[in-house]
Amino acid sequence: MLCCYPVKTLIARIPYRTLGVLPLIFFLAQAVYYWRTNQLGHMLWMCNAGNLIMALGLFFEKPALVRLAAIWTLPGLVVWFVYVVLAWGVFLTSTLAHVGGIAVALIALKRYRMDRAAWRYAFGWYLLLQLISRFVTPPAFNVNLAHSVASGWERTFQSYWSFWLVLTAVTAVTLWVAGMILWSIFRPRPAAELVVREV
């Protein structure tokens, strides 16, 4: 199949596929850390799983995967800074997963751009991973807030499901905003520009 592509096209593809190695390294570094501390359940947090999704999207050239992972890097970075950095400090593997993850996402979007509807896939991915987290992770970890009300919000919400409904609505709005921000920066290129680039 390689002979069917122009040399210029092949060269252009190599860097972005190779870029997938970085989020894979970030994911594996976190996996090693949590394996050593016997906390592998934490690998299902959105940002950790997002690095794996980003790597797969880059390796297999799947724009939808790249975009949904990229959208999650924005709220993920904020949540990580507030609830991890300010509370526990900076850790190498965690920093790579979040700061490195958003850096790779921004580079990847230079090629794959952003779709205005991509936030819906990011939201669907969140619901799926939260459901999986509820069944396969220890309740004590409360991964993706799938088991109980977030610490500090117990007085505001009398039940987990009222908390979940608000959380889900806020998450949907946040992902929409993140998607629109990235779309405003990485709008799809006009068809005429794409033709010029391919020539």
Regions found by a protein language model. Name each.
Residues 4-22:
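N-terminal membrane topogenic signal
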Residues 24-32, 73-84, 124-135:
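Aromatic-anchored segments of alpha-helical transmembrane domains
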Residues 32-40, 83-92, 111-112:
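Membrane-interface helix caps and helix-loop-helix hairpins in membrane proteins
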Residues 43-56, 93-103:
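Membrane-embedded alpha-helical segments of multi-pass membrane proteins
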Residues 66-74, 94-96:
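Cytoplasmic-side transmembrane-helix entry/capping segments in multi-pass membrane proteins
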Residues 100-119, 130:
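Alpha-helical transmembrane segments in multipass membrane proteins, preferentially the mid-helix core
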